[in-house]
């Protein structure tokens, strides 16, 4: 029985300038309410999607994002509310940009791979340099080419960092500690990673042989899709104090952003877990509104296996970004004929966008241990939080928001308000407005490349035919997304970056 669009609207209420409430009853069995953050233009997109779904036009097999936020609110053990961030768009199970927290002390509470996503620990790392735009402009093309030559890119790309099966086992367990030991990372890189680049509960034995086989050749590679390495320049500084703490002191300063994840290995870990969980749901009689929300009780063998395998895939992704950092440092050193150290190629921060983690949060005045699912959303802890690096204790955690190819990116900082409202979580990027298939139908790849060239952006692409999927037109406007988070107070703007070169899968 489907309701009309007007009937659906009765369950939606605007509670502040940037926030809507989804009341219980919007979908069956909601344990808690839902909320989503939008500004006027993002709001239109959300409601348009719901209206189309009511007419019977689905979103490529996915439910509209609002319905997905509601269905997550119906999962066993969820606390407080199911939260949609401004870049939310429909995805597998959970919408991308939907976060939810589950009570670790509730025996019914679940973990859902759909709440993490297939690209486990897909994330972003930002490096700074002491170069200025004027240093890079004359050698921009050489630099883009050097990065393209150093970093293996594209769908089936193979890594250049030598690795055998034993190395992979160790990397899955150790994360950035492996890169450090092998000489592919600097000691201080680790300080500036979420989780210090290593999830301790990782167990390589919970990663299937098939996943390892997919992961072994891909280490230190940039995938296709929305993965990229970008040379960027500082375009605007909103918070000078925070920027200085990050080593950013003037407009025009050159940075490098690396966006990548756990490649085929993470995808296989998620796929394997979904199969195991379908069985667990039958056994434990867990009922969900959407079968894509396959899940298992956190304490069940399937739940624990997934968390250990997911942590290992997370570690793989950190090693992957560390390896690409190593290759980026080499490329810059070669072009500028100096050492990475002399170029001050330090990691500002490294964040994850797709992960589930155990965290302490205050809910209704009580501290609780929660399993926080962040899918297409970023941890944004406030100043003085014990889990962020010493350097950022006074500023709050840096949050890296990658725009889309050829648009700007942002660095934000976490806030206390975000801690209370969204479990210390904010947006992760622009968020799709057009599906991949639609983008391919509507856009021509040569036009997209020409447009970037007109903007003075050097571009190196391994699979040009995939470029349309990632064209700025396929996405929501990242500035809208970031401003919504800023105005809602769940994170604050620190720095805006614009690209001068893009290296893509």
Swiss-Prot record:
Residues spanning the signal sequence: none
Keyword annotations of the record: Cytoplasm, GTP-binding, Isopeptide bond, Ligase, Manganese, Metal-binding, Nucleotide-binding, Nucleus, Phosphoprotein, tRNA processing, Ubl conjugation
Catalytic residues, chain numbering: 428 (gmp-histidine intermediate)
Gene3D superfamilies: tRNA-splicing ligase RtcB
E.C. number: 6.5.1.8
Phosphoserine modified-residue sites: 300
Positions bound to Mn(2+) 1: 119, 122, 227
Enzyme class: ligase
GO annotations of cellular component type: cytoplasm; endoplasmic reticulum membrane; nuclear envelope; nucleus; tRNA-splicing ligase complex
GO molecular function, one term: metal ion binding
Chief site of localization: nucleus
Cell compartments where the protein resides: Nucleus; Cytoplasm
Free-text cofactor note: Binds 2 manganese ions per subunit.
Cross-link annotation Glycyl lysine isopeptide (Lys-Gly) (interchain with G-Cter in SUMO2), location: 496
One of the protein's GO biological processes: placenta development
Cofactor(s) the protein requires to work: Mn(2+)
Catalytic activity field: a 3'-end 3'-phospho-ribonucleotide-RNA + a 5'-end dephospho-ribonucleoside-RNA + GTP = a ribonucleotidyl-ribonucleotide-RNA + GMP + diphosphate; a 3'-end 2',3'-cyclophospho-ribonucleotide-RNA + a 5'-end dephospho-ribonucleoside-RNA + GTP + H2O = a ribonucleotidyl-ribonucleotide-RNA + GMP + diphosphate + H(+)
Residues annotated as binding GMP: 226-230, 353-354, 402-405, 409, 428-431, 504
InterPro entries in the cross-refs: RtcB (IPR001233), RtcB-like_sf (IPR036025), RtcB_euk (IPR027513)
Reported function: Catalytic subunit of the tRNA-splicing ligase complex that acts by directly joining spliced tRNA halves to mature-sized tRNAs by incorporating the precursor-derived splice junction phosphate into the mature tRNA as a canonical 3',5'-phosphodiester. May act as an RNA ligase with broad substrate specificity, and may function toward other RNAs.
Miscellaneous field: Ligation probably proceeds through 3 nucleotidyl transfer steps, with 2',3'-cyclic phosphate termini being hydrolyzed to 3'-P termini in a step that precedes 3'-P activation with GMP. In the first nucleotidyl transfer step, RTCB reacts with GTP to form a covalent RTCB-histidine-GMP intermediate with release of PPi; in the second step, the GMP moiety is transferred to the RNA 3'-P; in the third step, the 5'-OH from the opposite RNA strand attacks the activated 3'-P to form a 3',5'-phosphodiester bond and release GMP.
Family: Belongs to the RtcB family.
Official protein name in the record: RNA-splicing ligase RtcB homolog
Organism: Bos taurus
Protein encoded by which gene: RTCB
């Amino acid at each position: 029985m489907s309701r009309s669009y007007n009937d659906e609207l009765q369950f939606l209420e605007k509670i502040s300038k940037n926030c809507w409430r989804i009341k219980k009853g919007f979908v069956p069995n909601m344990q808690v309410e839902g909320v989503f953050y939008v500004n006027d233009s993002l709001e239109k997109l959300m409601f348009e999607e719901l209206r189309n779904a009511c007419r019977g036009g689905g979103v490529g097999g996915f439910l509209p994002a609002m319905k997905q936020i509601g269905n997550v609110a119906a999962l066993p053990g969820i606390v407080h509310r199911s939260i949609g961030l401004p870049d939310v768009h429909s995805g597998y199970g959970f919408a991308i940009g939907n976060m939810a927290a589950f009570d670790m002390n509730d025996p019914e509470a679940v973990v859902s791979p759909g709440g993490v996503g297939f690209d486990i620990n897909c994330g972003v790392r930002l490096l700074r340099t002491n170069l200025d735009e004027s240093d890079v402009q004359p050698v921009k093309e050489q630099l883009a080419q050097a990065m393209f030559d150093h970093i293996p890119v594209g769908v089936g790309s193979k890594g250049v960092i030598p690795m055998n099966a034993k190395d992979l086992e160790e990397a899955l367990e150790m994360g950035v500690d492996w890169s450090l030991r092998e000489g592919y990372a600097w000691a201080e890189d680790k300080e500036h990673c979420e989780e210090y680049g290593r999830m301790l509960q990782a167990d390589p034995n919970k990663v299937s042989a098939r996943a390892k086989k997919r992961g072994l050749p891909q280490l230190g590679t940039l995938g296709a899709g929305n993965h990229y390495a970008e040379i960027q320049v500082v375009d605007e500084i909103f918070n000078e104090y925070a920027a200085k703490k990050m080593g950013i002191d003037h407009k025009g300063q050159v940075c490098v952003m690396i966006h990548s994840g756990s490649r085929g290995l993470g995808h296989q870990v998620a796929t394997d877990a979904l199969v195991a969980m379908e069985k667990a749901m039958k056994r434990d009689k867990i009922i969900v509104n959407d079968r894509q929300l396959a899940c298992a009780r956190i304490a069940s063998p399937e739940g624990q296996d997934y968390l250990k395998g997911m942590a290992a895939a997370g570690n793989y992704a950190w090693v992957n970004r560390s390896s690409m950092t190593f290759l980026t440092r080499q490329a810059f050193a070669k072009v500028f004929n100096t050492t990475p150290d002399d170029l001050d190629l330090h990691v500002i921060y490294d964040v994850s966008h797709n992960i589930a983690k155990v965290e302490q949060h205050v809910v209704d005045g009580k501290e609780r241990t929660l399993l926080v699912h962040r899918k297409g959303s970023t941890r944004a802890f406030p100043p003085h939080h014990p889990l962020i690096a010493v350097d950022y204790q006074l500023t709050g955690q840096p949050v890296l928001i990658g725009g889309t190819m050829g648009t700007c990116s942002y660095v934000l900082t976490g806030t206390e308000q975000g801690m209370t409202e969204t479990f210390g979580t904010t947006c992760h990027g622009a968020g799709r407005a057009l599906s991949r298939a639609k983008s391919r139908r509507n856009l021509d790849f040569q036009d997209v490349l020409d447009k970037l060239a007109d903007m003075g952006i050097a571009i190196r692409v391994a699979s040009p035919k995939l470029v349309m999927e990632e064209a700025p037109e396929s996405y929501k406007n990242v500035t809208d997304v970031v401003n919504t988070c800023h105005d809602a107070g769940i994170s604050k703007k620190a720095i805006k970056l614009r690209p001068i070169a893009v290296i893509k899968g």
